[in-house]
């Protein structure tokens, strides 16, 4: 017995038997797991499976000469393998799905999608595994870019966009010939909401077919710079020509036409509402001795931001000078108070002779009724006054008056009616009342004619001004205001 125990092989065998007995004893308390046919009795590593979605597809082809359509952007991939390998693949996605078309020519082909860089121990299935592609020759063409505004109705009140400035104006579009031929619109969009000043932005270029569908093409550059000038509220107004200097002897103005006859002014709405016309368009008559085209600057009124155009052309036609005398032109009254009477002391006839000078054409058309001779008695108190004689009439005519001033007497209507009882004074008062009514009517007519003359087609708003002369014999020349 001692000899048996001293044998080392015997001890090893006994130890192995005890180990087997211990293993059986430990596992005897657990329900046995049924084994599949062919499965080893000893434990093995577990397997797993997962489906990954939206895996990108890489296309390999000659992209310098060809364009390929039909390759899906993404696919679904199912991976199988050990739990650790599947877990790692799900996290890293370090494999690649691709379509190899480098050996294919133009036309339609069925291409198998493949995977590479797959870890050992993994199997991969791709859905879809086959795709139909079309290969066409690559074409590049230049197209202009159109700018589309949106939210234009939401701009600040009175503001509006002008023509956009695009840089670059054209882009290079590359794609298959069929797609290039179907291009209907190349545009970039600009949002105008709340705009009240010039907009500068970069915008993406999008390409559409005739049905409004975006096309899969390459655009170079894909982003362009757009500048949109934004204008403030505006309105068109006429302008008045202010004549300075004197025409050379024997020369008269036959006609003046302006091009354009109106200009556009830009500014706040309050400024525009108060602006009816523009003054100060100057014309120097001393420099005119023949038919001429003169460029004149339009002055910028207070509060106006811009005028367009800033210059106008005045086309001036000249002629020889003719004259005509009109006798006993009646003097009308402007600005007479309803509580006053007026009496002309000198001239007592309330009329003087007037000589008109101008081109033969204008003088031949002139009638006595065209001449508006008047005195302005606004704000004058009762008593005797020497008031200036003024004249309005057709444009391009100058006037010579027999005198500079008229002597008048203003009286209150109340004092006249309370102190005069005899028939001659009563008759005189009736005549005065009649004269006053006539003068009131003349005042209204003069005011109307003055407004009419201030809005002539050349917008020449200069009122005739009489030159100082001797009261009895001197002659006053004034330039007529335009109708």
Curated annotation (Swiss-Prot):
Pfam families cross-referenced by the UniProt entry: YbbR (PF07949)
Localization annotation: Cell membrane
Bias type Low complexity, positions: 413-430
Signal peptide span: none
Disruption phenotype: No visible phenotype.
Keyword Repeat appears in the UniProt entry: yes
BP terms from Gene Ontology: positive regulation of adenylate cyclase activity
Annotated membrane topology: Single-pass membrane protein
Domain of life: Bacteria
Region described as Disordered: spans on this chain: 410-483
Residues passing through the membrane, by range: 9-26
Any single GO CC term annotated in Swiss-Prot or TrEMBL for this entry: plasma membrane
Domain spans labelled YbbR-like: 55-135, 143-228, 237-316, 329-394
Keywords: Cell membrane, Membrane, Repeat, Transmembrane, Transmembrane helix
Transport among keywords: no
Gene3D superfamilies linked: 2.170.120.30, YbbR-like domain
Function noted in UniProt: Upon coexpression in E.coli stimulates the diadenylate cyclase activity of CdaA about 20-fold. In B.subtilis c-di-AMP is a second messenger that mediates growth, DNA repair and cell wall homeostasis; it is toxic when present in excess.
Subunit organization: Interacts with CdaA.
Protein name, entry field: CdaA regulatory protein CdaR
Organism: Bacillus subtilis (strain 168)
